[in-house]
């Protein structure tokens, strides 16, 4: 009888609450790499979610895809730092003042190929001539010095180190540019302009500010999202084996600020790309099933559980969240993206919102753990939250107090 009463009481509790409350999420065994700035420097903090402190602080730089190298530039010297020990493994004296190109609008450094075998450094500022260095990371050696008349900035380097993609500004005042290919073996610019294969075949001036980008797993594509004043945002799908690209227009709300809130997430097989904008409540799916023709297959307004229309309006001061504003589960079934405030869990089968979390946070950056079990969110005050990828359960929240946040660079197994 006692067992029966306990069973009945248990059922009553479930019926009264609707479901059994989920257990709190235990801290995962991971290390976080956060880029931050202080009054005196920019840095990369290595953070332990268990102890909730920064175990080490390193100079701001570009992390290799495997997390084994941190490349930094200081005082005309390129350094290869072991992120785990903090020791300088190798260094290379540079022939002048060069910098790591930015990978995101928020200032996270880039310049690496998808496989991490090549690194490009460039001079800064709009000048009458442009200078870059192509470096083999295996040897930490300059293989090519590129000197060009005009204003060029780095866009991408392919995995073979033979094709350097550059943005050439044709009108600095208007912000017009075009994409060119520097043929490394020939030591010269190709005589062609990278064309929009989805257009009319005629090169046209491009405009826009690059927010962030993601490589395909095979290194054949670089997908970048750009915001344009008055024209909405677009995804620039750049083929890194041939001189062509696709420009895929994203929905335009008419608000210039909204265009700065697009983020990209790519499935593990590289076939499905999601462009998400929490400020607009919009998600666009781009498929590249054959590996040659990326195209928009659907766009949907995402209803956010418990949110009002006003909750989908962000201010332009938080535009840097475009660095890492969306992540996917390993199976591609769940998309987590930043909303106006907090995070939104989206079912990719229907592109409908399932739940939301951290509704009082302005999320600055977002990454997933390598095993796909955790989501780590960084807010504008530098606090970090750990959540479950499958169901959004909350884990710990803490502030490691490493400085003003720039973004999360990497999550790796502890």
Task: For each feature predicted by the language model, list its residue ranges.
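C-terminal motif of bacterial Sec signal peptides marking the signal peptidase cleavage site
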Residues: 14-16
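Repeated scaffold domains used in trafficking and secretory/extracellular systems
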Residues: 20-24, 57-68, 73, 97-112, ...
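Short coil/turn segments that connect the beta-strands within blades of beta-propeller domains
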Residues: 28-30, 66-68, 115-117, 160-162, ...
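Short loop/turn segments that connect beta-strands within beta-propeller blades
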Residues: 48-51, 83-86, 136-140, 184-187, ...
């Amino acid at each position: 009888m006692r067992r029966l009463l306990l069973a009945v009481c248990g059922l009553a509790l479930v019926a009264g609450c609707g479901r059994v409350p989920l257990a709190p999420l235990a801290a995962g065994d991971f290390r976080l790499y956060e880029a931050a700035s202080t009054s005196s420097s920019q840095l990369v903090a290595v953070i332990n979610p268990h102890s909730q402190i920064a175990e080490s602080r390193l100079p701001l730089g570009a992390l290799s895809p495997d997390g084994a190298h941190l490349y930094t530039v200081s005082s005309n010297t390129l350094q290869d730092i072991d992120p785990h020990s903090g020791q300088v493994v190798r260094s290379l004296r540079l022939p002048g003042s060069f910098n790591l190109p930015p990978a995101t609008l928020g200032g996270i450094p880039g310049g690496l190929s998808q496989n991490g075998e090549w690194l490009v450094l460039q001079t800064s500022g709009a000048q009458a001539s442009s200078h870059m260095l192509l470096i083999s990371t295996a040897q930490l050696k300059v293989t090519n010095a590129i000197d060009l008349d005009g204003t060029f900035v780095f866009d991408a380097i392919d995995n073979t180190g033979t094709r350097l993609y550059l943005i050439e500004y044709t009108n600095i005042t208007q912000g017009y540019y075009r994409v060119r290919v520097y043929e490394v073996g020939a030591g010269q610019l190709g005589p062609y302009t990278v064309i929009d294969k989805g257009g009319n075949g005629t090169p046209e001036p491009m405009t826009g500010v690059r927010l962030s980008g993601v490589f395909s797993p095979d290194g054949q594509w670089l997908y970048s999202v750009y915001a344009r004043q008055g024209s909405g945002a677009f995804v620039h799908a750049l083929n890194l084996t041939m001189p062509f690209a696709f420009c895929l227009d994203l929905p335009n709300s008419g608000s210039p600020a909204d265009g700065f809130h697009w983020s990209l997430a790519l499935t593990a097989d590289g076939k499905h790309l999601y462009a998400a904008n929490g400020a607009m409540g919009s998600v666009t799916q781009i498929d590249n099933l054959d590996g040659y023709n990326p195209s928009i297959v659907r766009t949907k307004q995402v209803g956010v559980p418990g949110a009002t229309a006003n909750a989908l309006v962000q201010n332009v001061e938080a535009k840097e969240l475009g660095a890492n504003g969306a992540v996917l589960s390993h199976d591609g079934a769940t998309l987590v993206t930043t909303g106006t405030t907090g995070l939104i869990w989206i079912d990719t089968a229907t592109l409908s919102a399932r739940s939301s979390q951290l509704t009082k946070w302005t999320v600055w950056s977002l990454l997933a753990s390598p095993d796909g079990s955790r989501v780590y969110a960084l807010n504008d005050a530098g606090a970090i939250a750990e959540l479950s990828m499958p169901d959004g359960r909350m884990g710990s929240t803490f502030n490691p107090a490493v400085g003003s946040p720039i973004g999360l660079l990497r999550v790796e197994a502890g």
